[in-house]
């Protein structure tokens, strides 16, 4: 059915537009040249963004895209794609208060629930902190981001090459080496 990551996004996107979905979800499509991240936002609507070549994504169980270029998604589709009626959906439901083609879908479609601060944002924070320990201040009163931050970056350029062992460590994390370690 598909021969590339881009085709995967378009194929799943067309199925979502036709059949819809009950809940929000995300899925990555990868080929030898690029990676795309698609998020369903409920109903028959979806958005997708290409992961920059030099970047990584830490994605817990919540919507994560933090920047979205609607103009590119609806026309050129160089870095972004979405369901055909996304602009109308956003306008009709008053989901973008910036009135700009470049908006934050996490704010428009995502959640900022207390449960996110227990189950989701801490996992993203730990991974970002692990892969970029010096890029940002991750702890303390003057931290750029904390485990409860709702504005964690969706993607970042790592400070060093990420290894399989690094990924295993982050995926098995219980926040070891931080004040948030429950053990």
Labelled PLM ranges:
Residues 1-51, 55-60, 152-158, 162-165:
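Structured, non-membrane catalytic/scaffold regions adjacent to prosthetic-group chemistry
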Residues 9, 13, 20, 32-35, ...:
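C-terminus-biased signal that marks the final domain/tail of proteins
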């Amino acid at each position: 059915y598909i021969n590339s990551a881009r085709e995967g996004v378009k194929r799943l996107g067309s199925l979502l537009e036709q059949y819809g979905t009950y809940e929000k979800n995300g899925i990555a499509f990868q080929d030898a040249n690029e990676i795309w991240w698609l998020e369903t936002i409920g109903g028959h609507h979806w958005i997708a963004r290409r992961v920059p070549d030099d970047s990584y994504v830490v994605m817990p169980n919540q919507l994560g895209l933090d920047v979205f270029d609607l103009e590119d998604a609806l026309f050129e589709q160089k870095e972004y794609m979405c369901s055909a009626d996304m602009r109308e959906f956003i306008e009709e439901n008053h989901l973008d208060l910036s009135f700009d083609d470049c908006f934050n879908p996490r704010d428009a479609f995502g959640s900022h629930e207390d449960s996110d601060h227990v189950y989701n944002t801490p996992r993203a924070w730990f991974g970002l902190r692990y892969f970029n320990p010096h890029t940002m201040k991750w702890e303390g009163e003057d931290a750029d981001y904390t485990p409860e931050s709702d504005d964690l970056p969706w993607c970042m350029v790592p400070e060093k090459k990420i290894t399989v062992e690094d990924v295993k460590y982050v995926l098995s994390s219980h926040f070891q080496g931080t004040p948030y370690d429950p053990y």
